[in-house]
Amino acid sequence: MMDKKCTLCFLFLLLLNMALIAAESEEGANQTDLGVTRNKIMTAQYECYQKIMQDPIQQGEGLYCNRTWDGWLCWNDVAAGTESMQYCPDYFQDFDPSEKVTKICDQDGNWFRHPDSNRTWTNYTLCNNSTHEKVKTALNLFYLTIIGHGLSIASLIISLIIFFYFKSLSCQRITLHKNLFFSFVCNSIVTIIHLTAVANNQALVATNPVSCKVSQFIHLYLMGCNYFWMLCEGIYLHTLIVVAVFAEKQHLMWYYFLGWGFPLLPACIHAIARSLYYNDNCWISSDTHLLYIIHGPICAALLVNLFFLLNIVRVLITKLKVTHQAESNLYMKAVRATLILVPLLGIEFVLFPWRPEGKVAEEVYDYVMHILMHYQGLLVSTIFCFFNGEVQAILRRNWNQYKIQFGNGFSHSDALRSASYTVSTISDVQGYSHDCPTEHLNGKSIQDIENVALKPEKMYDLVM
C-alpha cells in the first residue's frame, strides 16, 4: 500500500514539474537565441567601456596599442610587436570557450589590420575550427544518453510488472528491489526532461525560471535515492546474514526513511547553498565545489555498502563454512549481484575527477562515462531481475503452462501437466532460494524441500 502511495506521489510531482517546464519553455520561446546573444554582447561591451575609462593610463616607455573593444571582446594595452591572447567568448553555440582568440599589435603600435578589408582584425578562426567534430560528438553523446535512459525505463518497468504481477515473488528483498527500480525510473524520467526541455533550451536558461531549478533539485535528490536504496540492499543483507543470522523478518520502515527520506537532506542543503553562493541560471553549471554536498554522501554510501558486502562474504566463507553450507551458498548468490553492482555504480565518482588530456583520450573518456552514468537502470534491472533465478523459474513455468494449454498435437495432457508442475516446483524452490531463502524455507532444510518437491514426480512415474 505504501509502495502505491509513494508511486502516485512521485508521478504527480514529475508530471507537475513537466507541465511547469513546458509552460516556461513556451513563454520564453519568443525570446530568440539571437536576443540572448545580443544581451551578452551588450553587457560585455558596457563592462569593457567601464574598464577602459577606469584603468590607469599606460605610463611605460615605448610604443603600445591602446585598449579597445573589438565588437566581441575587450583588449588591454599591449606593447608593440606582441600578440595578445584570451579565451573564446560563449556567445554562440558553435564557439568553443576552451580555444584561444589572438590579436596582434604591430611594431608601430597599431592593431593589426586585415589586408582584405583594411580594418582592425581579431583572429577568431580557432573558436569554431573544430566545431563540426565537437557538435557531432556532442550529438552522439546526447543520443547515447537518451537511448540509455529510454532502455533503462523500459527494462525497469518490465521488471516492476514482473515483481508486482507474480505474487509468489513477494518478500522483503523484492520489496527493496521495487523501491530501487522505482527510484531509477524516476531519475531517468527527470534526466530526459532536464536534457530535452532545459539543457538544450538557451532561451529558457536565460530567463532562469524557478521550475528549471526545481527540476535540478529533483534530479539531484533522485540521484541520491538511487545510491541510498543500493545501500539499503547492502544493509538488509548484512542484517539478515551477519547480525541476525538468517532472521526471518525486518522492519522496512527504516529502509524507507533511508532510501527516500535521507537524500532530501543533502539536496536541500545544496539548494540553499547554491542559491546563496553560486546562483547560476537553472543551477546548470558543474563548475562548483558545492556539488560535493551531493556527491559526498553518495561516495560515503558506496564505501559503507562495499564494507558491508565484503563483511558478508567474509562471514559466508568462514563462519558458515561448516554449518548451513547449503544456505551459505544460496546467500552468496544474492550477495554476488549487489557486490557486482556497487563498484559499477560507483566507478563514475572515481573516474570523474581524472579527465585525461588529448582529443582521442577525452572522447573515449566521455563515451565511457556516459555509458556508466546513463545505463545504470538497465544494468540494475538486468542483474536483479532478468538474471534472477527465481524470476527465470517463474517465467519458465508460466511459459510451459501456456504451451501446454494452447499447444496442439500433445497427447496425455494430464501427464504433461503433472510433469510441468513437478519441474516448476523444483525450479521454484531453487529460484526462491536465490533472493528470499529464509522466507521460503520455513525452518526446513534444503534436502527436506527437495524431497517434498520430488513426490509428484514419483507419482507421475507410477502413473506412467
Curated annotation (Swiss-Prot):
Name of the gene: Calcrl
Functional description taken from the UniProt entry: G protein-coupled receptor which specificity is determined by its interaction with receptor-activity-modifying proteins (RAMPs). Together with RAMP1, form the receptor complex for calcitonin-gene-related peptides CALCA/CGRP1 and CALCB/CGRP2. Together with RAMP2 or RAMP3, function as receptor complexes for adrenomedullin (ADM and ADM2). Ligand binding causes a conformation change that triggers signaling via guanine nucleotide-binding proteins (G proteins) and modulates the activity of downstream effectors. Activates cAMP-dependent pathway.
Transmembrane portions of the chain: 140-164, 176-198, 210-238, 253-273, 290-314, 330-351, 367-387
Disulfide bond residue pairs: 48-74, 65-105, 88-127
Signal sequence bounds: 1-23
A GO MF term: adrenomedullin binding
Positions carrying Phosphoserine: 420, 445
Protein name: Calcitonin gene-related peptide type 1 receptor
One BP annotation, GO: protein transport
Any GO CC annotation of this UniProt entry: endoplasmic reticulum
Family statement drawn from the similarity comment of this UniProt entry: Belongs to the G-protein coupled receptor 2 family.
Site (Required for ADM interaction): residue numbering on this chain: 202, 373
Keywords, alphabetical: Cell membrane, Disulfide bond, G-protein coupled receptor, Glycoprotein, Membrane, Phosphoprotein, Receptor, Signal, Transducer, Transmembrane, Transmembrane helix
Glycosylation sites: 30, 66, 118, 123, 128-129
Subcellular location: Cell membrane
Membrane topology: Multi-pass membrane protein
Topological domain spans for side Extracellular: 24-139, 199-209, 274-289, 352-366
Site positions per UniProt: Required for RAMP3 interaction: 250
InterPro entries the UniProt entry points to: GPCR_2, GPCR_2-like_7TM, GPCR_2_calcitonin_rcpt_fam, GPCR_2_CGRP1_rcpt, GPCR_2_extracell_dom_sf, GPCR_2_extracellular_dom, GPCR_2_secretin-like, GPCR_2_secretin-like_CS
Originating species: Rattus norvegicus (Rat)
Subunit structure: Heterodimer of CALCRL and RAMP1; the receptor complex functions as CGRP receptor. Heterodimer of CALCRL and RAMP2 or CALCRL and RAMP3; the complexes function as adrenomedullin receptor.
Residues in the Cytoplasmic compartment per record: 165-175, 239-252, 315-329, 388-464
Region (Required for RAMP3 interaction): 288-289
Residues under site feature: Required for ADM2 interaction: 286, 295, 354
